[in-house]
From Swiss-Prot:
The keyword Hydrolase applies. The active site is at S127, K164. The lineage of its organism: Bacteria, Bacillati, Bacillota, Clostridia, Eubacteriales. InterPro entries: LexA, LexA-like, LexA/Signal_pep-like_sf, LexA_DNA-bd_dom, LexA_repressor, Peptidase_S24_LexA, Peptidase_S24_S26A/B/C, WH-like_DNA-bd_sf. GO terms for biological process: DNA repair; DNA replication; negative regulation of DNA-templated transcription; proteolysis; SOS response. PANTHER family: LEXA REPRESSOR (PTHR33516), LEXA REPRESSOR-RELATED (PTHR33516:SF2). Residues 29-49 bind DNA. Keywords: Autocatalytic cleavage, DNA damage, DNA repair, DNA replication, DNA-binding, Hydrolase, Repressor, SOS response, Transcription, Transcription regulation. The record marks A92, G93 as: Cleavage. Its EC number is 3.4.21.88. GO terms for molecular function: DNA binding; serine-type endopeptidase activity. This is LexA repressor. The gene is lexA. It comes from Desulfitobacterium hafniense (strain Y51). Belongs to the peptidase S24 family.
């Protein structure tokens, strides 16, 4: 695979790629040595220098883990992508991710989403403008049924989905807009669909 590298150097390069792919950052010199059976850090440094001279990596000598993969055939630097469903409508009594609700998908790096179940909604209206959420924005929502006071949520009320700040009061739920010209909504019958964790906007 790498005709100008020895087997040991190939093992080192493949290990670096795997660690970057799995963890998002390169291994230390000691970790490389442990992985390929080299006790001497100076020997590892020697192999890294050869790999760098061959054009497969770039190092920053002032930092302990600064190894950048330059090999164009490597997928170590490629972020995996997930396609998040964009929900066109929210129907009472129906699962939010029901196929008929999904109008499109939006690509995001997997490390943004992690292992959460997420969806996106397009915001309609100006009730959350002071929170930086504008009419037409796409919001990224982590699906969950509970929320803490002050969190921005997507909630179902009167068979409609709304984006507001959540506050649990003595006997009622208050859904607070972030717009001084709009009044809060008070209700006992509120279903939390998820917490807003991101906002995406196209600037024209």
């Amino acid at each position: 695979m790498y005709p100008d590298l020895s087997q040991r150097q190939t093992d080192i390069l493949e290990y670096i790629k795997r660690v970057i792919r799995e963890k998002g950052y390169p291994p230390s010199v000691r970790e490389i040595g442990d992985a390929v059976g080299l006790m001497s850090s100076s020997t590892v440094h020697g192999h890294l220098q050869t790999i760098e001279e061959k054009g497969y990596i770039r190092r920053d000598p002032t930092k302990p883990r600064a190894i950048e993969i330059l090999d164009s055939s490597s997928d170590a630097n490629e972020k995996k992508t997930v396609f998040v469903p964009i929900i066109g409508k929210v129907t009472a009594g129906q699962p939010i991710l029901a196929q008929e609700n999904i109008e499109d998908t939006f690509p995001l790096p997997v490390d943004v989403v992690n292992s959460d179940t997420v969806f996106m909604l397009r915001v309609k209206g100006e009730s959350m403008i002071d929170a930086g959420i504008m009419d037409g924005d796409l919001i990224l929502v982590r699906q969950q049924k509970v929320a803490r006071n002050g969190e921005i949520v997507v909630a179902m009320i009167d068979e409609e989905a709304t984006v507001k700040r959540f506050y649990k009061e003595k006997t009622l739920i208050r859904l607070q807009p972030e717009n001084p010209y709009m009044e809060p909504i008070y209700s006992q019958d509120v279903t939390i669909l998820g917490k807003v964790i991101g906002v995406f906007r196209i600037l024209h």
